């Protein structure tokens, strides 16, 4: 978490002032009707999209399987698929838009994470200037080092990058897929393939 001495309103004012300067350098008139409020809107949008830099990481809510006396399957794999995310590419500050899939192997203690907490972790690490390869690594580390202490974590990212969509090569179809492995997933190809099959089968039967 990065520290700043400026409060939110002051941050908006300072960023907006610089956006006005950029508009002028681009040959625009920031005082014309359509642009009068643009600097402040852009400032607020940038602060929202980078909020993960200035807020503490979310805590994972832990639940325990078997606490009701029921027997649970050992080495159970939990899969959270199709977590929508958006981030800003750190090279061009243009959007990255896609989906994250998270799989983890439940520890012998039977601890599992609250569903929404995994989504919050994805959102937290997405909310900053980012590259997709690092994003999946950070999500994997956060879950692997959490209180649920999984035996393994696998995080898959699949996204469109606007830096290649609207500029440069202007490829409208290309997507980037990145995968991070931790624990048992790191060396066990069968477990990796099992997760890919789960995702493939879920897509075939339109499981949402």
Swiss-Prot record:
GO cellular component, as recorded: cytoplasm
Classification via InterPro entries: GTP-CH-I_C/QueF, GTP-CH-I_N, GTP_CycHdrlase_I, GTP_CycHdrlase_I_CS, GTP_CycHdrlase_I_dom
Reactions catalysed, as given in the entry: GTP + H2O = 7,8-dihydroneopterin 3'-triphosphate + formate + H(+)
One Gene Ontology term from the biological process aspect of the record: tetrahydrobiopterin biosynthetic process
Pathway: Cofactor biosynthesis; 7,8-dihydroneopterin triphosphate biosynthesis; 7,8-dihydroneopterin triphosphate from GTP: step 1/1
Keywords: GTP-binding, Hydrolase, Metal-binding, Nucleotide-binding, One-carbon metabolism, Zinc
Alphabetical list of HAMAP family matching this protein: FolE (MF_00223)
Quaternary structure and interacting proteins, as annotated: Homomer.
Family: Belongs to the GTP cyclohydrolase I family.
Protein name from the UniProt record: GTP cyclohydrolase 1
Gene giving rise to this polypeptide: folE
């Amino acid at each position: 978490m990065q520290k700043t001495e400026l409060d939110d309103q002051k941050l908006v004012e300072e960023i907006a002032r610089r956006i006005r300067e950029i508009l002028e350098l681009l040959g625009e008139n920031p005082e014309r009707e359509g642009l009068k409020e643009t600097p402040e809107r852009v400032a607020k949008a940038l602060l929202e999209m980078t909020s993960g830099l200035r807020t503490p990481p979310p805590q994972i809510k832990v639940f325990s399987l078997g606490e009701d006396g029921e027997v649970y399957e050992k080495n159970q794999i939990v899969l959270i698929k199709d977590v929508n995310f958006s981030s800003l590419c750190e090279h061009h500050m243009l959007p990255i838009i896609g989906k994250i899939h998270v799989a983890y192997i439940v520890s012998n203690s039977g601890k599992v994470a609250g569903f929404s907490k995994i989504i919050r972790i994805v959102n937290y690490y997405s909310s900053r200037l980012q590259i997709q390869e690092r994003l999946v690594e950070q999500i994997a580390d956060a879950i692997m080092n959490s209180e649920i202490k999984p035996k393994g974590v696998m995080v898959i990212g699949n996204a469109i990058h606007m830096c290649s969509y609207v500029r440069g090569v202007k490829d409208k179809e290309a997507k980037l897929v990145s995968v991070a492995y931790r624990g048992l997933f790191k060396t066990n190809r069968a477990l990796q393939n099992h997760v890919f099959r789960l995702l493939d089968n879920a897509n075939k039967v339109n499981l949402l």
